[in-house]
């Protein structure tokens, strides 16, 4: 199996402020967290784990032969949870790259994850994250994050406001991060920053501390489930792909 030096970690917390027990909500016949895990698992990375504080989530994943790492319920962010899980992986000294996949993207394409891994290994960036080209109508909601980049694809700034101002086309940021191990270790040691707290975007902590984030272009914007309305969209999309036999 390739990529033995890579770990994929899916942080999943049971309590959500906007959607009760979000990971256990059904999309079709299976839960949100099951769908995320099954999609990610198509990347065929041996070290693929769900990091959670919940026995219920753990039981769901174990039933489909997934691997679970228990983490503390008081961990502040998904990235911090991913790091705590990484430290508990057996023989983790052989792992040099950690992919943090948000646990609310039920139709994430495994090809996007493989592209992140390839780009991370073949660049000098501390972190790599995927983006999709979209029009203004696609990013009006403040839950959608855009990124401004330089001509090489290096991230300059992330915002919940459409950036750059006046553009007709934007780069929509997907909530997946590929970290070099030393970059993840540095990130979790840093205090929250002004811009991070202002925008409520933890990736700004990275930029404010002089670390580099490279972006890689992917084709599709996967549905992210954060609200009841998002869940309805995901269920509708699931019915559509089932009807098409995809």
UniProtKB/Swiss-Prot annotation:
Name the domain of life this protein comes from.
Bacteria
Its BP terms in the Gene Ontology are: CMP-keto-3-deoxy-D-manno-octulosonic acid biosynthetic process; lipopolysaccharide biosynthetic process
Query: What enzyme class is recorded for this protein?
Result: transferase
Which reactions fall under this protein's catalytic activity? Answer: 3-deoxy-alpha-D-manno-oct-2-ulosonate + CTP = CMP-3-deoxy-beta-D-manno-octulosonate + diphosphate
Pathway the protein acts in:
Nucleotide-sugar biosynthesis; CMP-3-deoxy-D-manno-octulosonate biosynthesis; CMP-3-deoxy-D-manno-octulosonate from 3-deoxy-D-manno-octulosonate and CTP: step 1/1; Bacterial outer membrane biogenesis; lipopolysaccharide biosynthesis
Record EC number: 2.7.7.38
Subcellular location, in the record's words? Cytoplasm
Q: Mostly located where?
A: cytoplasm
Question: Which is one GO molecular function term here?
Answer: 3-deoxy-manno-octulosonate cytidylyltransferase activity
Instruction: Report which residue ranges the record marks as coiled coil.
Output: none
UniProt keyword annotations, A-Z: Cytoplasm, Lipopolysaccharide biosynthesis, Nucleotidyltransferase, Transferase
Gene3D superfamilies from the xrefs?
Spore Coat Polysaccharide Biosynthesis Protein SpsA, Chain A
Record bears the keyword Cell cycle: no
* GO CC term (a single one): cytosol
Q: Which PANTHER family does the record associate with it?
A: 3-DEOXY-MANNO-OCTULOSONATE CYTIDYLYLTRANSFERASE, 3-DEOXY-MANNO-OCTULOSONATE CYTIDYLYLTRANSFERASE, MITOCHONDRIAL
UniProt function note: Activates KDO (a required 8-carbon sugar) for incorporation into bacterial lipopolysaccharide in Gram-negative bacteria.
Record's family?
Belongs to the KdsB family.
Per its record, how is this protein called by name? 3-deoxy-manno-octulosonate cytidylyltransferase
In its UniProt entry, the species of origin is given as Rickettsia prowazekii (strain Madrid E)
């Amino acid at each position: 199996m390739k990529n033995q030096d890579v770990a994929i970690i899916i942080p999943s917390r049971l309590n959500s402020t906007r959607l009760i027990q979000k990971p256990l909500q059904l999309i079709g016949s299976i839960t949100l967290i099951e769908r995320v895990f099954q999609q990610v698992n198509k990347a065929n990375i041996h070290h693929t784990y769900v990091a959670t504080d919940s026995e219920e989530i753990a039981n769901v994943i174990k039933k489909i032969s997934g691997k679970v790492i228990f983490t503390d319920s008081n961990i502040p962010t998904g990235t911090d949870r991913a790091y705590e899980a990484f430290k508990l992986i057996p023989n983790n000294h052989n792992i040099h790259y950690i992919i943090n996949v948000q646990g609310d993207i039920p139709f994430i394409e495994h090809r996007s994850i493989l592209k992140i891994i390839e780009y991370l290994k073949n660049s000098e960036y501390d972190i790599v994250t995927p983006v999709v080209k979209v029009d203004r109508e696609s990013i009006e909601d403040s839950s959608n994050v855009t990124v401004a980049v330089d001509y090489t694809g290096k991230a300059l700034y992330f915002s919940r406001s459409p950036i750059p101002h006046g553009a007709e086309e934007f780069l929509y940021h997907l909530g997946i991060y590929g970290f070099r191990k030393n970059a993840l270790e540095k990130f979790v040691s840093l205090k929250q920053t002004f811009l991070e707290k202002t925008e409520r975007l933890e990736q700004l902590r990275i930029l404010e501390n002089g670390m580099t984030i490279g972006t890689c272009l992917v084709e599709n914007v996967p549905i992210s489930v954060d609200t009841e309305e998002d869940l309805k969209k995901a269920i509708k999309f699931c019915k559509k792909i089932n009807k098409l036999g995809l």
